[in-house]
């Protein structure tokens, strides 16, 4: 039978049809067509027998019984007619084959098996059987052995699920029936007065307990509200305390910062005071130094040489600074200087000298110039020479007075010796000539002695301070 071309309706694989299916008799065909419907009806009758009739009302059972079975429905008639149109029958075969009234069964003559010998008629008859079976179930026939096993497993699983649903439905109906029975029992009006009295007493007791619980609930709600208000108030107090604490800490930090700033300022001020204490104000005010061949006081050159001409205005200003410094030393040291009176007036400073014989005061000009003078022509001297001699005498007397008032006389010795009009052997007199290198060098030595005298005088002034 390998020439048959039927395929599995599920996996579309070729089927090897057994010869017993090809040579089916009419009785065998009727058995195949009616077996599924009868099986379904018998199963439904078995499962839905006594239990359903005990639970389902009679009115619903009548409606269920009036429903037609699948075998009574005309399903697949049009399909069978369509399939039949492809079968070629002989005159004898046409007279033997016809449909019954319900469309689900075939009429077969006794001689059908003997006359139906053609392969096409057999295939057509078998296809009609498969079509009818497919219409009566949810399975498309034919199927192979593998697909058949799969379908059996699936149907078995669905069957078990339906059984579970049925059991659940029965259990639910049973519970409903029990509830209805219990309601009928409790609703029975033949209860005794004692039981009703007990129920009434129990009801009153439950109501009383309910009222007590509601009262306790109200008390608890009030307590909860009170505690919540107290908690909120306490939290606000804590927040306020934290704010105050933060403010205090900020003020404390600011106070510490201010104190530290004041301490730092104090340290800076003390350091500045120490530096000022160590500072010699006289040395800073009168800076005596040298610049080449010239001695300088506050950057003013005292002297002049032929190669470097210094104007008399600068020389006079330097002499004015010398007179101012000597007057300051006399004032701060309180050293006696009865024969001289220093008058610092800048570039026109003068020195007053008392004549011991006549007891008269003479004014000596501590400034000069390049103008022509008759006295310098006849006396061969310059008016500034007397002021320079007076400055030498004042320096010598001040050094002697400082030495007489100190316990270390050797420490007051001047670096350049002063004798009459000479200092370190160089004459301080300018005479009628113009400034020279010798006179400039003598002025330089003069400033050096004044610087030493200033240092000793400053030491004495500092010791005299309280």
Curated annotation (Swiss-Prot):
It is a peripheral membrane protein. Disruption phenotype: Still forms preautophagosomal structures (PAS) in proximity to the vacuolar membrane. Residues 439-464 are annotated as: Required for membrane-association, autophagic function during starvation and normal autophagosome morphology. InterPro entries: Atg6/Beclin, Atg6/Beclin_C_sf, Atg6/beclin_CC, Atg6_BARA. It is found in: Endosome membrane; Vacuole membrane; Preautophagosomal structure membrane. Keywords: Autophagy, Coiled coil, Endosome, Membrane, Protein transport, Transport, Vacuole. Residues 43-53 have a biased composition (Basic and acidic residues). GO terms for biological process: autophagosome assembly; cellular response to nitrogen starvation; late endosome to vacuole transport; mitophagy; protein transport. It holds the Pfam family APG6_N. Residues 149-258 form a coiled coil. One of its GO terms (molecular function) is phosphatidylinositol 3-kinase binding. Residues 279-463 are annotated as: BARA. Residues 35-55 are annotated as: Disordered. It comes from the Eukaryota. One of its GO terms (cellular component) is phagophore assembly site membrane. The C-terminal domain called the BARA domain is dispensable for the construction of both VPS34 PI3-kinase complexes, but is specifically required for autophagy through the targeting of complex I to the pre-autophagosomal structure. Belongs to the beclin family. Component of the autophagy-specific VPS34 PI3-kinase complex I; and of the VPS34 PI3-kinase complex II. Required for cytoplasm to vacuole transport (Cvt), autophagy, nucleophagy, and mitophagy, as a part of the autophagy-specific VPS34 PI3-kinase complex I. This complex is essential to recruit the ATG8-phosphatidylinositol conjugate and the ATG12-ATG5 conjugate to the pre-autophagosomal structure. Also involved in endosome-to-Golgi retrograde transport as part of the VPS34 PI3-kinase complex II. This is Vacuolar protein sorting-associated protein 30.
